[in-house]
């Protein structure tokens, strides 16, 4: 694997035998840089605003939305917090989205998943104004991504790209294996890696739950991006020496002392062979939140026709 140990703008590695890619540090640097972009927009008379809509009783979702609001406050983005009873009819959520679409003071809309069973997630995503779709999941934005003309990149894959760039990991010509085929991570990640752009130009193999002999694919990889949502499915025996491992998974598993968070990669054994690896937590997760801010700032710049530089 071609791995460059050059100091980058967002310094994120520690000089040990295996490089630990610190997403918390990179995300903090991006948030710091976004403040100047937000200030430039505010000086034109507009404050960027993100509206979040929560329609579930999941404590983890509630905590995650709260963290997003804290991030917004840090960089100067205003927020609007909307909570809908999970038992309410789907029409109430649809009407809320329609109202936010029509509100010119709202620049980004995020509907927190999961949604109740009686609400069609696809219809909700289609209903959001594509220019306010800061998750990047509207069919129009998905199409633009596939065409190589993205308006908003989905936050987790975009965050992974930023990590690869920050760690000076060479993707051009690399064999990259993406494990997982979700619309949120796996599919857009594979698309971004093959594009003619920074953190692109890789040769990509997509694997999933029906892939035969997964280990044979991962052992041939220069870069592994594990996003299947299966606790510790990848261990050191499944990777070759010198591989870069990006662990997207965040799974709560029961232990003798209660529970703990683990990734899709068994960290200890993988770290012994990897050139670089992300921790869980503290790797990809903070980057996902940072790129939501990034997309919201970009959405505001588009809405106000303001020229800004994004980190």
Swiss-Prot record:
Q: What is its EC number?
A: 1.5.1.5, 3.5.4.9
Q: Which GO terms describe its cellular component?
A: cytosol
Pathway this chain belongs to: One-carbon metabolism; tetrahydrofolate interconversion
Q: Which SUPFAM superfamilies match?
A: Aminoacid dehydrogenase-like, N-terminal domain, NAD(P)-binding Rossmann-fold domains
Q: Does the keyword Transmembrane apply?
A: no
For the keyword RNA-binding, the answer is no
Q: Which is one GO molecular function term here?
A: methylenetetrahydrofolate dehydrogenase (NADP+) activity
Q: State its role.
A: Catalyzes the oxidation of 5,10-methylenetetrahydrofolate to 5,10-methenyltetrahydrofolate and then the hydrolysis of 5,10-methenyltetrahydrofolate to 10-formyltetrahydrofolate.
CDD domains (alphabetical): NAD_bind_m-THF_DH_Cyclohyd (cd01080)
Q: Where does NADP(+) bind?
A: 180-182, 209, 250
Which Pfam families does this entry report, sorted A to Z?
THF_DHG_CYH, THF_DHG_CYH_C
HAMAP family, per this entry? Answer: THF_DHG_CYH
**Originating organism:** Haloquadratum walsbyi (strain DSM 16790 / HBSQ001)
Mind telling me which InterPro entries this protein's record contains?
Aminoacid_DH-like_N_sf, NAD(P)-bd_dom_sf, THF_DH/CycHdrlase, THF_DH/CycHdrlase_cat_dom, THF_DH/CycHdrlase_NAD-bd_dom
**Can you say what this protein is called?**
Bifunctional protein FolD
Going by the UniProt record, its keywords in alphabetical order are: Amino-acid biosynthesis, Histidine biosynthesis, Hydrolase, Methionine biosynthesis, Multifunctional enzyme, NADP, One-carbon metabolism, Oxidoreductase, Purine biosynthesis
